[in-house]
Structures are given as C-alpha cells and as structure tokens.
Amino acid sequence: GGAGLPRAEASFDVSEKNSVKEYILRRLLYSAMTLLAIATILFVMFRLMPGDPTAQVISPALDEVAQRRMREAFGLDQPMIVQFFLYLKNLVTLEWGRSFTTSEKVFDILVYRFWNTMLLMAVGLLLTFAIGISVGMVMGWRRGGKLDLGATVVSLVMQSAPPFITGILLLIVLSYRLDLFPTGGMSSPGNRPGDLLDFIVSADFLHHLVLPTITITAYYLATPMLIMRDSMLEVLGSDYVEFARAKGLPPGRVMIRHAARNALLAVVTIFSILLGFAIGGQVIVETVFSWPGMGLAMVEAAARHDYPVAQASFLMLAVIVIVMNLVVDISYCWLDPRIRLGS
C-alpha cells in the first residue's frame, strides 16, 4: 500500500507545476489581449479627435502634388484599415513614426521620457510603500493609540486632496514664497552630468525630486498604510501569533517576524491596483512640476494634435501598468499557493 504514495505525491507535484504554467500562460494571454484592445482604442480615438492633425506637417500653402507626397510619407493616404494594420506592425517593430511637430523619431523622444517617468514613479511608490507598511504595522500593533488615530486622520486628509492641489500648494509655499526648492524640471539649466548614475545621485537632481515625490507619497500613502493596519489586526488574532507570544518571544520579533510578515500579502495584492492609479496621477504630477516624462509629453502632444507622440505615450503608460500587473499576479501565485490550483 505504501509503495503507491511516492507516485501519488509525484503526480500531485506534476499537476501543481502544470497548474502554475497554465496560470502564467493564461495571464500572458489576457495581458496580450488587453494590450491589443488598448492599441485599437487609441488608434480610433486619436483619429476621431477634433481638428486636422495633418495641418501640423502639411501646410495648406503647398501645392496638391506636395501635399499628396507628404500624406504618402506619413501613410495618411492609405485606407483606414490598412493604416490600422501598418500601425500594429509598426508598434511591434518599434517603428512608431515621426513627430508631426519636431520630425524626430517618436521612439527616440519617448525612450528618454520613459526613464524620467519610471525614475519619479519608482521613488514615489517605493517611499509610499516603505512608509505605509512601516507605519501601518505599528498602527495595527498599537491599535487605538495616538499614532493609530493621528496617522489615520492625516493620511485620509492627504488622500482627499487631488495631487494637482497638493503640488500647487507645495510650489506656492516652498518654491515661490520660501524659495527652498526649484519650481520645476529635473535639473538646473546647464547642470546635467553626462553619466546617468552621477546625475541621479547629484544634489541638484535630488533637490528637484523632493516636491514631486512628496506629492506622490502624500496622495497614495493612505492605501498601503491602512491596508497593512487592517491586515495586522487580522493576523494578530491568529493562533501562530498567540503561540509566539506564549513562547516568550520579544514583542518586536513577534510583530515583525510573525505578524507583519504574514500581513504583507494583503499589501502585495493592492500594488497593481495602486500602480494603475499612480500612472494616471503621474500625468498630473509631471504637468504641475514640468517633469520631462511621458505624462508631460502626452499632454503636450495632445494639445498640438501630434498623435504619433500622444498615442505612443498612452500605449507605453498602458504597457507599464499591464507588465506590472502581470508581475504582481505571478508573484502572488508563488506567495499564495492556493492561487496555483484555484480558479
């Protein structure tokens, strides 16, 4: 009878591994379908915008032959369905065309902007989650204390203020009146080292980074902090925490090693949701602080009817959200084994 157990366990391991592969493949398929849907919506939306985008590059003063050649160069003479499939092919091959206003390659414009956006967003979200998890852990451990009540009120007040209001107030008080921080941009004129690492650790860059980071952190801090607090309260009533206390372990070790470690799973689940909101907020923050990222590029391009840049910016922001959601889904699959064999 016992001889059959190893085969049964091996069979279970194989089925579990297959379920993980199926789950990952399913998520990859959903992500690809979502990206295709977004690309299609962007193609249609930018061609339904009011105004004539071709007026930016095709002057009415040109004769008909010159205008026709310009339309052919930009592929605007083709039927809409042909333009759509060319658009999809160009997306895959990274041939995103040229800007209608500057004639630069769209890919070259946005690669530079992409890293600027990722840098600001990464610093803002890392700070948000680091503070939120740490404070939320202590709030849950000391429920009903002054920190619990005070941090809850302050975080909810900060979250209720839109990021553009917070950003403008910070600029008025700390930049214009007190002259403590720059009013915008990533660096002072003529003060940008060639090496990326030297630049991001320079005092000038960090000085420009402070206000946008405070704006992002202030707006999104309440979510991870309050979820960590509530998750801690649930975990603190569990048997293994009570057992750790009964063993006489130090309170700090019980809080961090036994309670907080298990409470973190709830925070991981909301990361992808918060990321989606953060992408939308990034557009506002970059516009308020003149941060040269994709959000600002998208706003400027939409205002100029430069739809090659605008739709590529939208798409790149969507790709960031989709990829990060995929990473979180897969990591959650490993963190919570119930997902592997679940629906």
Model-predicted segments: where are they?
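Alpha-helical transmembrane segments of integral membrane proteins
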Residues: 19-23, 110, 114-147, 163, ...
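Hydrophobic alpha-helical transmembrane segments of membrane transport/permease proteins
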Residues: 34-85, 174-201
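An internal, D/E-rich "acidic patch" concept
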Residues: 14-17, 77-133
